[in-house]
């Protein structure tokens, strides 16, 4: 099915299902139902089934899913078996934390470069062993290292300029942590992650719980 017909929330939930199934397989749970997946994740079983139905049949009604086969199937859909070379633009606290996060490598995302425009940071070596490159070298480095995904961790005022540079260098996917929307061509995918929005959403739910309305 064409990607544009699959709801973006479904794609995000697939990643959550994948992580859940990994844990279940480690616990030697060889079969699992949509109800069990839903209970583990706080998602309706009908939603789990609907999400999976976009990609064909994974299990049998009344029997459930083979955990390993479902994990492999979702992994193939998400491209997890592939290795994705990634770069980070902005060597501030957030950018450095992401670059040093070992979970990315385990998920198939390899940070091949970190860029910044601060002369004091350029040439520094991160805990992960990555050397911070001058942002001016970004086009050359991205092409040389076959990087396809870029992560933006710069101030909002610089985000669009960085996005334009990433696109010009051939980047096909961008994770934008800057608190502003960016514009890119239709052939480039963007995931906007505004941490403040997550906190506001959480605050709403906590507020409702405190009021006893939930």
UniProtKB/Swiss-Prot annotation:
NAD(+) binds at residues 90-95. Pfam families: CoA_binding (PF02629), Put_DNA-bind_N (PF06971). Its main location: cytoplasm. InterPro entries: CoA-bd, NAD(P)-bd_dom_sf, Rex_DNA-bd_C_dom, Tscrpt_rep_Rex, WH-like_DNA-bd_sf, WH_DNA-bd_sf. Keywords: Cytoplasm, DNA-binding, NAD, Repressor, Transcription, Transcription regulation. One of its GO terms (molecular function) is DNA-binding transcription factor activity. Disulfide bonds: none annotated. It is found in: Cytoplasm. Homodimer. Modulates transcription in response to changes in cellular NADH/NAD(+) redox state. This is Redox-sensing transcriptional repressor Rex.
